[in-house]
Curated annotation (Swiss-Prot):
NCBIfam families: acc_sec_Y2, PRK12417.1. One of its GO terms (cellular component) is plasma membrane. This is Accessory Sec system protein translocase subunit SecY2. It is found in: Cell membrane. InterPro entries: SecY/SEC61-alpha, SecY2, SecY_dom_sf. Disulfide bonds: none annotated. It comes from Staphylococcus pseudintermedius (strain ED99). Belongs to the SecY/SEC61-alpha family. SecY2 subfamily. One of its GO terms (biological process) is intracellular protein transmembrane transport. The chain crosses the membrane at residues 22-42, 68-88, 108-128, 136-156, 169-189, 191-211, 245-265, 280-300, 343-363, 366-386. Part of the accessory SecA2/SecY2 system specifically required for export of possible cell wall proteins. The central subunit of a protein translocation channel.
Length: 407
């Protein structure tokens, strides 16, 4: 009798699925913490040079090169592979939707493996001192780094299926860890300058919060349900559909570009290159990154908005916009609105990230503090996305008992 009563209470508890997902995500994070503690190279064997930009970028993808460990490459190769495959299949979305999960995973894993090898080779050549057994040591370290990257991809994928927010909790933990391990230099700053910096950070965070919360609503007519005056039907898009994932992907692609150019230079000359112009310490490097952030942020936003699918759904359901013919005209109308919205949201995020990076070039003494501020903004952005995902799970948990009757 007592057991039946306990079972009834558990079955009626509306958040049980949500808490299972939280528990699974915590398990994934514990595995990530354990793997990041397994160092594969002694600290004395690491090259100490100015690589703040690379450490910043890697930490925002779940990696860590302060000390080379199993998960040093992070999720960068996987995120890059996903965006490349998504952009390739964008023109033929119907064919991509008919692919099985196994087919999609095979393509992602194969491309991730290749990108991991390129980035891993770059990390070893740039940040590890070479020994007499150079070739054997490089191959062994490369094997460990690539294996760790593939394991991280699997952990993030499992968290996407059974946990909360996919790769974002791993990246958030990596950013927090990186912020606490940074040793900021002591710089004498005037009180006025400090107040201005704090105000600018608060304003930037407030703008990011607005882009995450504000929706762009397009009202339409539903031929099945007549809208009430207080509850009109509308299609809702976020101001920045790409969210924080666009920042992670742009950093990943930028690192892939850096790694590829360094790899080609090393294969041609046989020397370890130091391409300062392709870093956050040079105007060219910052400009290239911001161009990548703008283009990839826009493309990712367009993928998420998916006006092609919206057009098909409207045509199938009989919904329409006033003064717009169904079919091709509706598609052109939605594409026009989506272009303006996605460019607007992407430009805001790029400006918020770009302005501090350019200021760090003008005031090099404050570069470490500016990188710290950028990480703080990215951390808050990730936290907002994770919170929104948790709210979505809570919303569906409330109707779980009803939906399970039909699933």
């Amino acid at each position: 009798m007592k057991n039946n009563r306990i079972t009834k209470i558990i079955n009626q508890y509306e958040y049980k699925i949500f808490y299972k997902r939280i528990a699974f995500t915590i398990l994934i994070l514990l595995i990530y913490i354990l793997g990041s503690k397994i160092t594969i190279v002694d600290e004395n064997a690491m090259r100490q040079h100015d690589s703040a930009f690379y450490k910043l970028a890697v930490s925002n993808m779940g990696g860590d090169i302060h000390q080379l460990n199993v998960f040093s490459l992070g999720l960068g190769p996987w995120l890059t592979a996903m965006i490349i495959i998504s952009l390739i299949t964008y023109k033929n979305m119907e064919k991509a939707m008919h692919q099985t999960r196994a087919e999609k995973h095979y393509k992602e894993k194969f491309l991730t493996l290749g990108l991991s090898i390129i980035q891993g080779y770059f990390v070893i050549n740039q940040f590890v001192r070479h020994t007499d057994a150079k070739r054997f040591t490089e191959l062994l370290l490369l094997l460990i780094l690539v294996t760790g990257a593939m394991l991280m991809m699997w952990l993030a994928d499992q968290n996407m299926r059974y946990g909360i927010a996919g790769p974002m909790p791993i990246v958030l933990l990596s950013v927090i860890k990186s912020m606490f391990t940074q040793s900021l230099p002591i710089v004498s700053i005037e009180i006025l300058m400090l107040v201005v910096m704090v105000i600018l950070i608060i304003v930037a965070l407030f703008i990011l919060l607005l882009t995450e919360l504000i929706e762009y609503r397009i009202h339409y007519r539903d031929i099945i349900e007549m809208p009430t005056p207080g509850q009109p039907t509308y299609l809702a898009w976020k101001i920045n559909p790409g969210g924080s994932i666009s920042i992670m992907i742009s950093l990943s692609v930028f690192l892939l570009l850096t790694s590829t150019i360094n790899l080609i230079f090393n294969m041609v000359t046989g020397k370890t290159p130091h391409l300062q112009w392709l870093s956050f310490g040079h105007y060219m490097g910052v400009t290239i990154y911001l161009i990548l952030q703008t283009v990839l942020g826009y493309l990712l936003s367009r993928l998420i908005v998916n006006t092609k699918q919206n057009t098909k759904d409207f045509l199938k359901n009989g919904n329409y916009f006033i003064g717009i013919r169904p079919g091709a005209d509706t598609g052109n109308y939605l594409n026009h609105l989506a272009k303006r919205l996605c460019w607007f949201g992407t430009t805001i995020v790029t400006a918020i990230i770009g302005v501090p990076l350019y200021i760090s070039l003008l005031v090099p003494d404050l570069s470490e503090y500016i990188y710290f501020a950028v990480q703080l903004m990215i951390m808050v952005y990730l936290a907002m996305n994770i919170t929104e995902t948790m709210r979505t799970y809570l919303y569906f948990d409330k109707y779980g008992a009803f939906l399970n009757q039909y699933w």
